[in-house]
Regions:
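N-terminal catalytic or cofactor-binding beta/alpha core of small enzyme domains
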Residues: 1-128
Length: 128
């Protein structure tokens, strides 16, 4: 079940800046939408919509950027690999949960404020 790689724009300007856009991914594979209780609409609630479009002008000027194409619903690039919500990922016992994972915002988000729990069933860890 491959996910889209990020768009990487090399640095070509004379300023030491790299822009990261981790939550703008909108390449939703059909299988991801099918796993979600609320469908695509529920998954869109996790996006930072159109931030990637805002960055395009800086990329045109040579500023480096890494722009996620994979949606945050599939993987949150701002989470550590051990920030696992056990209600989302079947992984066996977890020694301690981060506050974000306990709140449903682990490496694979488990809920949104508007839609509640996202997934029809837990995802096996080997699928990560």
């Amino acid at each position: 079940m491959p996910l889209s790689p990020p768009a990487i724009y090399p640095h070509r300007a004379h300023v030491p800046v790299l822009i990261s856009v981790p939550h703008a991914g909108r390449d939703y594979p059909d299988w991801l939408i099918a796993l979600c209780k609320g469908g695509a609409q529920a998954l869109h609630a996790l996006e930072d919509p159109l931030v990637d479009d805002l960055v395009e002008g800086t990329v045109d000027k040579g500023i480096g950027a890494v722009i996620a194409r994979t949606p945050r619903a599939a993987v949150d690039c701002n989470r550590a690999e051990d920030e696992i919500d056990p209600t989302v990922i079947r992984s066996g016992p977890i020694a301690s949960l981060s506050a974000r994972a306990r709140g449903g915002l682990g490496i694979v988000p488990g809920r949104t404020a508007m839609h509640g729990p996202l997934w029809r069933q837990p995802i096996p860890r080997h699928e990560l």
